[in-house]
A protein has these predicted regions:
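Amphipathic alpha-helical membrane/lipid-surface binding segments
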Residues: 4-94
């Protein structure tokens, strides 16, 4: 398995975990009072945006040639770290 394939697999696994987290938050939002529900919905929207950005980066990495991947890897990793950090911050607001 190439480093690019391993990277894509890692991102896919994280996105799957995020999807599960989003589903949990949506269930909590349905049970929340009206004021709290608005806050949940805002956070869920932010989390979905981060997930969508991660999916976009995963597709770019998957579609890149091996030579292009070598040149793009540092940029992808930096973007991934930023997306992951933002998602984590949104999740912490619920705890």
């Amino acid at each position: 398995m190439s480093s690019r394939e391993a990277y894509v697999d890692k991102i896919k696994a994280k996105i799957d975990a995020w999807n599960a987290d989003i589903e949990k938050m949506q269930a909590k939002a349905k049970e929340a009072e009206a004021d709290a529900r608005v806050n949940y919905e805002e956070q869920i929207s932010e989390m979905k945006a981060q997930r969508d950005e991660a999916e976009k980066k995963m597709k770019e990495a998957r579609d890149a040639s091996e030579s292009a991947w070598s040149d793009m890897r540092a940029g992808f990793e930096s973007a991934w770290d930023s997306i992951s950090d933002s998602f984590g911050k949104a999740m912490k607001r619920f705890q």
